[in-house]
Amino acid sequence: MDESSGDGDLGNEGHGGEGPAPSHSHTVQASDSPITVPGWDEYFLGIATAVSARAKCMRRRVGAVLVHEHRIIATGYNGAAPGRPDCLEGACPRGRLGYAEVPAFSDYDVPGTPGFCIAIHAEVNALLFATRDTAGCTAYVTDQPCPGCRKALAAAGVVRAVWPGGQFDVDELVDWSR
């Protein structure tokens, strides 16, 4: 099921029971003051933002949340492999460079190059630590997934990726013209 058009609040009639749950925030009149309720996409992107606060990268802090039928099955953030020194501890060659020193269009996945990055991306960490099958999930990410993460998400059966300002459906995840 698409997280943006579910059946309400996990089985109860939290949105009034009339039609699909909204994917964008809406205002509900409660007593004397209106309450703004975020849509599912906004809600899970907000959680991904909170997850990104755990990232150990000096350059980019990215969070990801894998969701199946409005239930979180995994979270992940970018950083070194568990138990390994991370960027904040000075272990990342890319993290030791100033922004002007990072080679333009460098391959951050090639060890020994000046732009090499030790981080495992947030999406991959979420996939690695998922507690359930990821087929049919939506990935909520704080930044557009890179090509490698798009491939990993598609291979894991993720059917949709959402980030602030954009989204890919199952076919777009592996459409390299995008």
Regions found by a protein language model. Give the residues of each.
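Zinc-dependent deaminase catalytic domain
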Residues: 1-178
